[in-house]
């Protein structure tokens, strides 16, 4: 009876992975209640085959879930319509509640029938036995056997806790349950006395900004968190997970962040290969509709690196909602997991981000300054210009206030706090992070990210002459035109390197540098072009084109 109840309340099972011979438990290991035997690919098909009763019951419950999601998103309009028609009176609401209660009882009955279907299936019974054994005893053997299954991630046991590193428990300066530290925007009206009257005047605007950010704004910024989109992508995500586990020997893990969100991660270890880059770990930060199952993780994988992918809060197996604070909390526990559980030193970690993932990547670089390098692909400097691009001009004040208070993705500000090597990849046909049209390459916000970084690190070089010549170089529409500008100013790379190395040897590596202070205008132009070319590479593609492995290069450093 207990097993039947477990089948009724248990998670949905999607797939049974093929188990490699090298990973199977030795035959001499005795079978115990906490060490059950996982299925081999020779005995069962790798796709879980539900019985007819479970299959049809699952379809009914999935359909009900979709209808509930549609009702949730359309509830404001439905409420307004029912109110106008007078259907919200007590005489109408009471019968409706009876109908709703009857429907819930029917769905509960369907769930029980699904449980009976699972109970009659030996595949599911063996899975639920392994799952229960792992929750009782998280031994390495139980975890290894549980990893052979792909199921609803909410039931996966937590593998790593944000407080697990001993240094976190002893230090008061680490993150609290309120979250890690973020750079906060300055007040919009500096110098104004923050009296009670001013607070009352601002209250309607603050409430409006909050409602916009938590309804339309967050879903526009992170469409991957919308349940209906995830439901449509589920088959693709399952295929991507199967590829990572079966072909790349990936290991899935659940991390608990300081805000209570559970973060879904996938680790592919290449340290045992002959490739030297396998000793380096690339932590991948996906875009606003990207998942590690099908996202930018494929680029460093193809290049031979060890890779750690993770999903934003609210994406696929990760819980929560993707606001900046939650994003930073998630990135923090991912980096801690890489250092304290996977055993990588910060000097062996590379942060790689695509598009909106640049926020968490730059936060990690700012918060963990010893990481080896940062690579930002198709990213931007600040969210406000891109948000203003897609909203009516009359909403400018509301949009700016909402972004600054609730959705402040200040990539450039965070990146300038990092002292290590940086590479920016600009897509020359990008249709997402341009503020006008894709053909207008100067409206690509990657340009502004580069300029802000160089102006912070080399303010004397990026004075008037240097800034002007870098803008000309950024405006070049082809590699031939870029080379023409570079050769026009007769950039001597050996001279530039010697100047920079001499300055570093004398003054140290900390930015900003005053190099170029006593230099001629032509010298500053040469240095500015040299530095721009070293920090930014062009990729002739649109925003969502996968980056080829040959374009995944380590950033330049002295």
Swiss-Prot record:
It comes from the Eukaryota. The chain crosses the membrane at residues 60-80, 93-113. One of its GO terms (cellular component) is membrane. GO terms for biological process: monoacylglycerol catabolic process; phosphatidylserine catabolic process. Keywords: Hydrolase, Lipid metabolism, Membrane, Transmembrane, Transmembrane helix. The active site is at 355 (charge relay system), 430 (charge relay system), 507 (charge relay system). GO terms for molecular function: monoacylglycerol lipase activity; phospholipase activity. Gene3D superfamilies: alpha/beta hydrolase. Residues 281-407 form the AB hydrolase-1 domain. Residues 114-558 are cytoplasmic. It catalyses: 1-heptadecanoyl-2-(5Z,8Z,11Z,14Z-eicosatetraenoyl)-sn-glycero-3-phosphoserine + H2O = 1-heptadecanoyl-sn-glycero-3-phosphoserine + (5Z,8Z,11Z,14Z)-eicosatetraenoate + H(+); 1-hexadecanoyl-2-(9Z-octadecenoyl)-sn-glycero-3-phospho-L-serine + H2O = 1-hexadecanoyl-sn-glycero-3-phospho-L-serine + (9Z)-octadecenoate + H(+); 1-octadecanoyl-2-(9Z,12Z-octadecadienoyl)-sn-glycero-3-phosphoserine + H2O = 1-octadecanoyl-sn-glycero-3-phosphoserine + (9Z,12Z)-octadecadienoate + H(+); 1-heptadecanoyl-2-(5Z,8Z,11Z,14Z-eicosatetraenoyl)-sn-glycero-3-phosphocholine + H2O = 1-heptadecanoyl-sn-glycero-3-phosphocholine + (5Z,8Z,11Z,14Z)-eicosatetraenoate + H(+). Its main location: membrane. Coiled coil: none annotated. The keyword Transmembrane applies. It is an enzyme of class 3 (hydrolase). Its EC number is 3.1.-.-, 3.1.1.23. Belongs to the AB hydrolase superfamily. ABHD16 family. Phosphatidylserine (PS) lipase that mediates the hydrolysis of phosphatidylserine to generate lysophosphatidylserine (LPS). LPS constitutes a class of signaling lipids that regulates immunological and neurological processes. Has no activity towards diacylglycerol, triacylglycerol or lysophosphatidylserine lipase. Also has monoacylglycerol lipase activity, with preference for 1-(9Z,12Z-octadecadienoyl)-glycerol (1-LG) and 2-glyceryl-15-deoxy-Delta(12,14)-prostaglandin J2 (15d-PGJ(2)-G). This is Phosphatidylserine lipase ABHD16A. It comes from Macaca fascicularis (Crab-eating macaque).
